[in-house]
Amino acid sequence: AGMLAPFFIGLIADRFINTEKVLGGLFILGSASMLILPQLAGPGKSSIVNTCILLHMLCYMPTLALTASISFKHLSDGVKQFPIVRVWGTIGWIAAGLLISFLDAEKTALQFYIAGGASLLLGFFCFSLPKTPAPLKGEPVKFKDLIFWDAWSLMKKPSFAVFIISSFLICIPLAAYYAYLQNQMSAMGITNVAAAKTLGQGSEIIFMLLMPLLFRKL
């Protein structure tokens, strides 16, 4: 979901449909899988649960790139302003974790209803964002676009190659963080796991706000 969906959805947003409309549609579709998951879950139905989560992630993962695309399109100075805008996403992430723990929803279906409801509201909100037309609308889709040739060619630049390789390596432990940290913290006797996990997101805020200062040194 994290590797393939963003590429194909990005292709649609680049050539066919306004980015804010694609973004809104993805959040609404993603909310549906979360809202129906508790209705379908039950003993012996782990495959159904995993399918619903996969469908949600197929909708969610492309939104990370699409929100960045909209931001850089409309911010007057994206390099300096984007980290300040993006940090509010992390603050929202922390708020959600605190809410889940406050409601003691970690082990109940309520967490899925909260996720689905938030995704639904966010989807409708996206339609109020500034219009961001597809930059390549009307242009034919070429074979090199399907294999992301232009993106691969950027690997010739050493700085970009280092960035991509580093990002790839960082995402390996990050996947384990998402998948297993809650079980590990529960085994350690930590209660209110969702709230405890926000400590990691708090460090993200610090480094994100430092980014404009670091860019000045480049």
Explain the meaning of each model-derived region:
Residues 1-3, 159-198:
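Helix-loop boundary and gating motifs at the non-cytosolic
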Residues 2-7, 93-94, 201-209:
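Residue-level signature of mid-helix packing/kink "hotspots" within the transmembrane helices
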Residues 24, 28-43:
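C-terminal ends and interior cores of transmembrane alpha-helices
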Residues 1, 80-90, 110-113, 186-203:
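Loop-to-transmembrane helix entry
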Residues 129-165:
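Juxtamembrane intracellular "pre-TM" segments in multi-pass secondary transporters
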